[in-house]
Amino acid sequence: MVHYNNMIMVNRVKIFSRWLTVAAVLLSLVQAKEAAAYIGPGAGIAFFSSFFILLATFFLALLIILFWPIRVLIQAIKHRLKYQKYFDQNSHRKTKRVVILGLDGMDPDLTERFMQQGLLPNFSALKEEGSYSRLQTTCPAISPVAWSSFATGLTPARHAIFDFFTRDRSTYLPILSSVDIQKPTGRLKKPKIKSLKKGRAFWEILGDVGISSSILRVPVTFPPVKFSGRLLSAMCVPDLKGTQGTFSFYTSRDSRLQQCTGGTCFKVVNRGEKISSFLYGPEDPSKKGAPESKIPFEVILPKTNSDCAQLLVCGQKFLLKPREYSPWVRLSFPVGRKKVYGVCRFLILETNPDFEMYVTPINIDPENPVLPISHPFVYAMYLAKVMNSYATLGLAEDTWALNERILDEQGFLDQTYLNHHEREQMFFHELDKVRRGVCACVFDTTDRIQHMFWRYLEKDHPAHRAGGEPGYEKTIEELYKNMDELLGRLRRKIDEHTLLIVLSDHGFKSFRRCVSLNSWLYLNNYLVLKEGAKESGEWFAQVDWSRTRAYALGLGGIFINLKGREAQGIVQPGAEFDRLKGELSARLSGLKDEAKGVVAINQIYDCQRIYQGPYTDMGPDLIVGYAEGYRISWDSAVGKVNGTVFEDNLKSWSGDHCLDPKIVPGVLFCNRKLKAASARMIDIAPTVLREFNLNVPPSMEGKPLFD
């Protein structure tokens, strides 16, 4: 703790000193202009006025720097006194610490099956010691929604997160639902970042009474909110380009040059000795047209595919073994007169006779983050000093590279487990430091591997027709066994004064068939295309909004083109609005896939009926509860329209949870007996507050599980 606090103080002084330097320079420039405007005796007065202002600024800066450590010390003492007062008043309570292990997407059906087979001894032991229950997820059953409810104890209508993205009502284009990032308005200004999630997380409320928390990679915590504790953000943290993850693929094969979803392909020339190309970073607003910044790199090729290549980039040299990820490589991109730092990994796929190399999305460098990815700001830097560099991208496992067959199965697994081991190192480092308070960490490994490898659980899954390597039939079973080993390590560090909670935000099911909601709406005259158009590209490019009553966007919802809400809305609020929702619900509930002879949609949920809250209107009007095996189509999710309603899902992304919430509950384990008859995601936050003897805020919709 001493090293960490010292680091905070030193970095604060450095940051403030830089700010004062810039302020002084800018002030001197302003005053210089005023002085230059005077001719004759007045110039001397103007000069001395400027001199005294600069002198006063210098002494003010000196005083602030001298007193800064005292201010930090006073704040630390105040927090310590508040912290000690709380635990003195509650010394009789059993719970001193709450540890939360989040395993995104851990499925109850698989968990129960593997426990019965004796494959998960630590989960079985935790169940016997305390409790196990299925955990009711949110509607819709999507990670940003569920984890927001976990943090706040609120339903979506009160925390305002209904999906990964929503629509801009003025343009019908997609926008991130959880964060608003605006580009700098000038060369000296930084991007403006604003969280769109409403409500307060339980760790913020605990911090009010001096109870500190360490929160690692809980989704939808970007940008980080100030509170009494430490936090590393996760889902929705962008890459250095400002996207949610853009990989690069370099190839000498013309046949591999394709338009890749989630990445960019670059042609290189293999002359047998070296490959030369560029890495592309953030836009440079100082140049005309704001082109992407770029830095050169070279790969010195080996004589055979089994030898190491040499990577030369940013004055650094790395040996690249074939099909083995490089360590994190630090990059510096020139943007104007500044440098912006990122990190990435390189993976040589082939060198002879053709060259192929994959590069991960360029993550924000945790040692020098261009955006706030942690609280305090220096916490990300501190972790990088403790454990070297690490993934900072919110969605760090590159599912699209596997979908596009740039990576093979092993390449994806290697990347995923590299990220997982980083997370384990962070988690256990923080766990050893947090003796009282909360330590929570969410692992994405369970979610990502099930998404991409579910097809191996089903011999007849349509995705097998699109390729993929054999031999991965046990991948998901091994995943669950690895999580059991993680739990075993964790349980050895849990004492009698620690409440241990292990949970997932949702379960998993097969994704075999795609449902194009927009095509169904088009074929049934709820969505209308422009004159002469038979289909539409992404983001409703050919949609005639003056005649469209309903449209689908995102992973789970249908929006009504409501007059007075959407920019070109035509459906009247009130009776017409309610009648249209009822009509769509009746026609889509029980919708049958005639080619397969099964129901594709179990139920349609009217948001205004299932939720009560001030932000109901920010979500979709109707949430679609898909049957097992079905999900919204890839095209429909991004606003495309064609004439096909049902089609096979051929992508490696073969498992999903964006279904009827009733069939994809999560799991809940804890080392104490539950008193509640059932458990919901919204119950976790109030449960943690009650364990520390705090009153649950009236705004929270969840209930404590041990009361």
Stretches with model-predicted labels:
Residues M1-A37:
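N-terminal secretory/membrane targeting signals
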Residues A36-I65:
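Hydrophobic alpha-helical membrane-interaction elements
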Residues A61-I77:
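Membrane-spanning helices that line or support transport/gating and their immediate boundary helices
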Residues Q75-T95:
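N-terminal signal-anchor transmembrane helix
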Residues R93-K96, L103, D109, G118, ...:
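Secreted, luminal/periplasmic, and some membrane-associated catalytic domains
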Residues S214, N419-F453, V624:
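Active-site regions of oxyanion-processing enzymes, predominantly non-cytosolic
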Residues R455-K474, N642-N649:
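A solvent-exposed, charged loop/short amphipathic helix patch at secondary-structure junctions
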Residues E628-D683:
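Low-complexity, glycine/alanine/valine/leucine- and proline-rich hydrophobic stretches
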